[in-house]
Structure formats: structure tokens, C-alpha cells
Regions:
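A structural microfeature
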Residues: 120-122
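Active-site helix/loop of acyl-thioester processing domains in fatty-acid/polyketide metabolism
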Residues: 9, 36-64
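Hydrophobic beta-strand-centered segment that forms part of the acyl-chain substrate-binding groove
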Residues: 52-93
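Hydrophobic beta-sheet segments that form the core/acyl-binding groove
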Residues: 9, 78-115
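Short beta-strand edge segments in extracellular beta-sheet folds
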Residues: 113, 125-129
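Catalytic strand-loop segment that frames the active site of acyl-thioester-processing enzymes
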Residues: 1-40
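Extended, hydrophobic alpha-helical segments
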Residues: 118, 132-133
Length: 133
């Protein structure tokens, strides 16, 4: 069974996307009523994957072809900062913004908001496989 830490896409533009996630008490990444650091990191990674998949789905296909979205691999995580762990019942809004893209590699800046506060942020390098393109 997959570990899901995004419930939907709330915004999308050419360079940025935002997801929503509701922290539930029985989730694998919840301990003592708090959503863990590892859950926040996975939420950022899944938001990046959601962004890439949705962005790819919006491209105009070539007639007669059904291309598959690229598969992403995390190459590096930099400056992962967590200032607070959200409680069960919280709504998290995670925004990823592509700051640089070249030859199948993206650098994204990510932030996770709970209420009005940014509770986590990082920079992530993602490599997109072109094998299935």
C-alpha cells in the first residue's frame, strides 16, 4: 500500500504548484499526535512528483502517442529546516517552485505552511528520467 502524503493539487502555474494534505491520526508518519520530520520531507517529495505529473499531463500530445510522465529521482536535499511539527488535524499547504531546469534536472525550492506559518522548507535537486519519453 502506498504512503500518501498529498491529498490534492490546489494551485499550478508554469513554475510553481501547491498541494494540500490533511494530517490524520492513524498515519504512518504520526507519533504522539505530531506529523514527523520524515513525513514533511516525503510531503515535499510527493508534491514535486504531483507537480511534474500534472504539468506533463497538460502538454499537448502528439497524435497517436500516449506518452508516460517522466520518473523523478531525488538527487540532493539542501537546507532542510523544520521549525514546528504539525498536529493531527492540521492542513498543510506545500508549495514547490522550479528555480532552475536543464537537461532533465530541476532545482526546486519548497515550503510547507500550516495556517499562516511556514513550518518547513528546503531546496531539492530532482532528476527526471527521459527513458520513457
Amino acid at each position: 500500500m502506498p504512503i500518501v502524503v498529498v491529498h490534492g493539487l490546489t494551485e499550478h502555474s508554469e513554475t510553481s504548484s501547491t498541494s494540500i494534505f490533511y494530517v490524520e491520526g492513524d498515519h504512518l508518519f504520526v507519533r504522539e499526535g505530531k506529523f514527523l520530520h520524515s513525513g514533511l520531507m516525503e510531503n515535499i517529495a510527493q508534491t514535486s512528483a504531483l507537480r511534474s505529473g500534472y504539468h506533463f499531463s497538460q502538454q499537448v500530445p502528439v497524435e497517436g502517442e500516449t506518452p508516460e510522465p517522466p520518473i523523478g529521482f531525488i538527487g540532493a536535499i539542501k537546507n532542510f529546516i523544520v521549525t514546528d511539527l504539525p498536529s493531527v488535524g492540521s492542513e498543510l499547504y506545500t508549495t514547490v517552485t522550479v528555480t532552475y531546469e536543464v537537461m532533465g534536472m530541476q532545482v526546486v525550492e519548497a515550503s510547507v505552511k500550516c495556517g499562516r506559518n511556514i513550518i518547513a522548507s528546503c531546496e531539492m535537486k530532482i532528476f527526471l528520467s527521459q527513458e520513457n519519453q
